[in-house]
Protein backbone atom coordinates (compact mmCIF):
# COMPACT_ATOMS: atom_id res chain seq x y z
CA UNK A 1 0.00 0.00 0.00
CA UNK A 2 1.26 3.47 -0.84
CA UNK A 3 1.79 5.03 2.58
CA UNK A 4 1.99 8.59 1.21
CA UNK A 5 -1.76 8.69 0.59
CA UNK A 6 -3.01 6.56 3.48
CA UNK A 7 -5.08 8.52 5.96
CA UNK A 8 -5.97 7.18 9.38
CA UNK A 9 -9.44 7.80 10.79
CA UNK A 10 -9.01 9.40 14.23
CA UNK A 11 -11.81 8.98 16.77
CA UNK A 12 -12.23 9.97 20.39
CA UNK A 13 -12.17 7.22 22.98
CA UNK A 14 -15.95 6.95 22.69
CA UNK A 15 -15.92 6.72 18.89
CA UNK A 16 -16.72 10.27 17.77
CA UNK A 17 -14.85 11.24 14.57
CA UNK A 18 -12.12 13.83 15.09
CA UNK A 19 -10.48 13.95 11.68
CA UNK A 20 -8.07 12.31 9.29
CA UNK A 21 -4.44 11.80 10.23
CA UNK A 22 -1.40 11.32 8.08
CA UNK A 23 0.58 8.19 8.82
CA UNK A 24 3.19 10.31 10.58
CA UNK A 25 0.58 12.01 12.80
CA UNK A 26 -0.88 8.62 13.72
CA UNK A 27 2.57 7.30 14.68
CA UNK A 28 2.97 10.24 17.07
CA UNK A 29 -0.28 9.23 18.83
CA UNK A 30 0.93 5.62 19.06
CA UNK A 31 4.37 6.64 20.36
CA UNK A 32 2.80 8.92 22.98
CA UNK A 33 0.61 6.06 24.21
CA UNK A 34 -2.56 7.94 23.28
CA UNK A 35 -4.09 5.20 21.12
CA UNK A 36 -6.45 3.31 23.44
CA UNK A 37 -8.10 1.09 20.84
CA UNK A 38 -7.89 0.36 17.14
CA UNK A 39 -10.07 -1.09 14.41
CA UNK A 40 -9.64 -1.99 10.78
CA UNK A 41 -6.70 -3.36 8.93
CA UNK A 42 -3.05 -2.78 9.67
CA UNK A 43 -1.94 -0.25 7.07
CA UNK A 44 1.75 0.17 7.87
CA UNK A 45 4.54 -0.95 10.16
CA UNK A 46 7.26 1.58 10.83
CA UNK A 47 10.63 0.52 12.23
CA UNK A 48 12.72 2.61 14.57
CA UNK A 49 16.11 2.27 16.15
CA UNK A 50 17.66 -0.53 18.16
CA UNK A 51 17.53 -0.68 21.95
CA UNK A 52 21.07 -0.38 23.32
CA UNK A 53 20.37 -2.88 26.13
CA UNK A 54 18.18 -5.51 24.47
CA UNK A 55 19.31 -5.04 20.89
CA UNK A 56 15.69 -5.22 19.75
CA UNK A 57 14.45 -2.90 17.07
CA UNK A 58 11.39 -0.80 17.86
CA UNK A 59 8.39 -0.88 15.59
CA UNK A 60 4.92 0.64 15.47
CA UNK A 61 2.09 -0.96 13.53
CA UNK A 62 -0.66 1.46 12.55
CA UNK A 63 -4.29 0.48 12.00
CA UNK A 64 -6.67 2.32 9.67
CA UNK A 65 -8.97 3.43 12.54
CA UNK A 66 -7.70 4.58 15.93
CA UNK A 67 -9.41 5.71 19.10
CA UNK A 68 -7.29 8.18 21.04
CA UNK A 69 -7.41 9.08 24.72
CA UNK A 70 -10.03 11.64 25.57
CA UNK A 71 -13.75 11.73 25.25
CA UNK A 72 -15.41 14.44 23.20
CA UNK A 73 -17.65 16.78 25.15
CA UNK A 74 -19.30 18.04 21.97
CA UNK A 75 -22.61 16.62 20.84
CA UNK A 76 -21.75 15.32 17.35
CA UNK A 77 -25.25 16.19 16.17
CA UNK A 78 -24.64 19.87 16.96
CA UNK A 79 -21.52 20.08 14.79
CA UNK A 80 -21.94 22.04 11.54
CA UNK A 81 -19.16 21.09 9.13
CA UNK A 82 -17.11 23.73 7.34
CA UNK A 83 -18.63 24.51 3.94
CA UNK A 84 -16.23 24.10 1.02
CA UNK A 85 -16.91 23.75 -2.69
CA UNK A 86 -15.26 20.34 -2.76
CA UNK A 87 -17.52 19.00 0.00
CA UNK A 88 -20.59 20.72 -1.49
CA UNK A 89 -20.05 19.16 -4.92
CA UNK A 90 -19.43 15.76 -3.35
CA UNK A 91 -22.56 16.13 -1.17
CA UNK A 92 -24.59 16.83 -4.31
CA UNK A 93 -22.83 14.02 -6.21
CA UNK A 94 -21.59 16.45 -8.86
CA UNK A 95 -25.13 17.08 -10.15
CA UNK A 96 -26.60 20.48 -10.95
CA UNK A 97 -29.56 21.17 -8.66
CA UNK A 98 -31.49 22.81 -11.50
CA UNK A 99 -30.99 20.75 -14.67
CA UNK A 100 -29.70 17.52 -13.09
CA UNK A 101 -26.67 17.27 -15.36
CA UNK A 102 -23.60 15.53 -13.97
CA UNK A 103 -20.48 17.68 -14.25
CA UNK A 104 -16.84 17.73 -13.28
CA UNK A 105 -16.01 19.87 -10.24
CA UNK A 106 -14.30 22.42 -12.48
CA UNK A 107 -17.62 22.94 -14.30
CA UNK A 108 -19.71 23.40 -11.13
CA UNK A 109 -20.29 26.49 -9.02
CA UNK A 110 -21.61 27.15 -5.53
CA UNK A 111 -25.09 28.54 -6.12
CA UNK A 112 -26.95 30.47 -3.42
CA UNK A 113 -30.65 29.65 -3.50
CA UNK A 114 -31.39 33.01 -1.90
CA UNK A 115 -28.66 35.24 -3.38
CA UNK A 116 -26.26 36.93 -0.95
CA UNK A 117 -27.33 40.30 -2.39
CA UNK A 118 -30.90 39.51 -1.33
CA UNK A 119 -30.07 38.52 2.23
CA UNK A 120 -29.09 34.90 1.65
CA UNK A 121 -26.34 33.32 3.70
CA UNK A 122 -23.36 31.21 2.70
CA UNK A 123 -24.65 28.21 4.67
CA UNK A 124 -25.25 24.56 3.82
CA UNK A 125 -29.03 25.00 3.67
CA UNK A 126 -28.80 27.89 1.20
CA UNK A 127 -26.31 26.44 -1.29
CA UNK A 128 -26.42 23.79 -3.99
CA UNK A 129 -24.17 22.69 -6.83
CA UNK A 130 -24.99 24.33 -10.14
CA UNK A 131 -23.59 24.15 -13.64
CA UNK A 132 -22.45 27.51 -15.00
CA UNK A 133 -25.30 27.91 -17.52
CA UNK A 134 -27.96 27.34 -14.83
CA UNK A 135 -26.19 29.59 -12.33
CA UNK A 136 -25.93 32.37 -14.92
CA UNK A 137 -29.56 31.91 -15.98
CA UNK A 138 -30.79 32.11 -12.39
CA UNK A 139 -28.58 35.08 -11.62
CA UNK A 140 -29.80 37.26 -8.75
CA UNK A 141 -33.28 35.75 -8.62
CA UNK A 142 -35.04 33.19 -6.47
CA UNK A 143 -35.75 29.81 -8.11
CA UNK A 144 -39.52 30.39 -8.25
CA UNK A 145 -39.08 33.81 -9.88
CA UNK A 146 -37.53 32.23 -12.96
CA UNK A 147 -39.32 28.87 -12.84
CA UNK A 148 -36.19 26.88 -11.93
CA UNK A 149 -37.28 24.47 -9.18
CA UNK A 150 -34.63 22.60 -7.22
CA UNK A 151 -34.33 18.92 -8.13
CA UNK A 152 -33.10 18.09 -4.62
CA UNK A 153 -33.13 19.78 -1.24
CA UNK A 154 -29.93 21.02 0.36
CA UNK A 155 -28.99 19.65 3.77
CA UNK A 156 -26.32 20.00 6.45
CA UNK A 157 -24.08 16.91 6.45
CA UNK A 158 -23.75 15.02 9.72
CA UNK A 159 -20.32 14.65 11.32
CA UNK A 160 -20.00 11.15 9.82
CA UNK A 161 -21.04 12.37 6.37
CA UNK A 162 -18.52 15.20 6.68
CA UNK A 163 -15.73 12.70 7.36
CA UNK A 164 -16.63 10.93 4.10
CA UNK A 165 -16.81 14.23 2.21
CA UNK A 166 -13.39 15.30 3.53
CA UNK A 167 -11.41 12.31 2.25
CA UNK A 168 -11.25 11.05 -1.33
CA UNK A 169 -9.28 7.90 -0.50
CA UNK A 170 -11.25 6.14 2.20
CA UNK A 171 -10.29 2.54 2.85
CA UNK A 172 -13.05 -0.09 2.80
CA UNK A 173 -12.97 -0.70 6.57
CA UNK A 174 -13.08 3.04 7.28
CA UNK A 175 -16.05 3.46 4.93
CA UNK A 176 -17.83 0.55 6.58
CA UNK A 177 -17.33 2.16 10.02
CA UNK A 178 -18.52 5.60 8.88
CA UNK A 179 -21.42 4.24 6.80
CA UNK A 180 -22.79 2.39 9.83
CA UNK A 181 -23.23 5.79 11.55
CA UNK A 182 -24.82 7.68 8.64
CA UNK A 183 -28.30 9.12 9.17
CA UNK A 184 -31.14 7.12 7.67
CA UNK A 185 -31.74 8.32 4.12
CA UNK A 186 -28.28 9.82 3.69
CA UNK A 187 -27.47 10.53 0.05
CA UNK A 188 -23.95 9.25 0.66
CA UNK A 189 -25.15 5.65 1.00
CA UNK A 190 -26.61 5.38 -2.49
Q: What name fits each language-model region?
A:
Residues 15, 88, 146:
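A residue-level signal for conserved active-site and pocket-lining positions in enzyme catalytic cores
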Residues 14, 121, 134-135:
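A generic structural motif
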Residues 21-22, 84, 96, 115, ...:
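Secondary-structure junction/capping motif
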Residues 80-108, 128-131:
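Short cysteine-rich loop/turn motifs with clustered Cys
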Residues 100-129, 138-154:
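Histidine-centered nuclease catalytic patch
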Residues 1-80, 85, 154-190:
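Short helix-coil boundary/hinge micro-motifs
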Residues 27, 131-132:
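Residues within alpha-helical segments
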Amino acid sequence: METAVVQILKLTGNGIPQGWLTLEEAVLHYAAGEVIWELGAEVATLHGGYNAVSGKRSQITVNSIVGVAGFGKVNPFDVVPLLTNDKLFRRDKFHCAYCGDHAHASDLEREHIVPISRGGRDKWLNVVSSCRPCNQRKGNRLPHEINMPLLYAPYVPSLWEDMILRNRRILADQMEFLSAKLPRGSRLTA
